[in-house]
Amino acid sequence: ELQSMKNTNQYTVLNFDQASRSLQIDVFDFATLKKVNTLIETKNQSQLSDGIDSYAFSSDEKQLLIANNSNPIYRHSFTADYFLYTIETKGLTKILEQVQEPTFSPDGKKIAYVKENNIFIYDIASKTNSQITTDGKKNEIINGITDWVYEEEFAFVRAFDWSKDSKKIGYIRFDETQVPEFSMSVFAKELYPKVETFKYPKAGEKNSLVSLHLYNVDSKSTKKVDLSQYNDFYIPRIEWTNDGNILSAKILNRHQDNLDLLFVDGTTAATKVVLNEKNKSYIDFVDKDNLTFLADN
């Protein structure tokens, strides 16, 4: 996967070097298409003997979050081990084991992630973890990660987002308690299959009850957003605007023919509808990662 650098003149690619049998993250020049640098090579990093599955830059592009030992869950979701790599010093440190969706804060000082259905924050300077939610439980409560329906129908996994000033995290909570269960045999490496049971609402059955929450990093407090005006609804996307105190949230009814775009106040959790879309048939949600906020919001 090609990733454009912020200088706009270069891009990075995860390559496999046949000669050294090594995975490496290479930097290329857009104008010449020639390689100009190699950021990291697995042949020089014993901790990455299992390879590199994916990587993400911090906002200043001085650090990399590198995933390996990935284990799939559903179509898009997976858990993985994660390493923090400092490009200038070439220092590599394993910081997280079998977690989901670790994401740098915009200021590059923290990493939010989900482990066993709860949200945590890793502080890079102090190398400490703090827990945001505590009620996560398999097949009951999910914080910050989508359930099967959202992953399959709305094509996203990470259900949390950092504010632009790195002071808040907005996240969706899924209560799957009343969703019917489905079991299936999984044939893996073992001699006999194992049975996996997960929440799977068929047409007309109960969906997860979703709620929207705002976490303040400094005060370590959480506010629940009042969405009581809606009934049997989805929250198919959340995204902080350019204003660090305004979260946008899309609210879609179950018939998927009525969509509200809300602005949520990051301090009071008050909401207002800034856009409504209706359709006699249904609202096409194939590509709804399409919000662009201007500089003045």
PLM segments and residue spans:
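Short, solvent-exposed loop/turn segments at conserved positions within beta-propeller repeat blades
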Residues: Q18-R21, I73-A80, Y113-V114, G204-S208, ...
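Short glycine-/Asp-/Thr-/Trp-enriched loop segments that recur within the blades
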Residues: N44-I52, N139-A155, Y230-I235, N279-K288
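Hydrophobic beta-strand positions that form the internal "hydrophobic ladder"
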Residues: Y11, L64, G108-A112, S166-I169, ...
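Blade-loop segments of beta-propeller domains
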Residues: L33-N71, L96-E101, K278-Y282, D287
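Beta-propeller domains
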Residues: V13-N44, P72-R75, I172-N297
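Short loop/turn segments that connect beta-strands within beta-propeller blades
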Residues: F30-L33, T86-K90, I124-K127, N216-K220, ...
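Predominantly five- to eight-bladed beta-propeller fold
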Residues: L33-K35, N69-Y74, F78-D81, I132-F160, ...
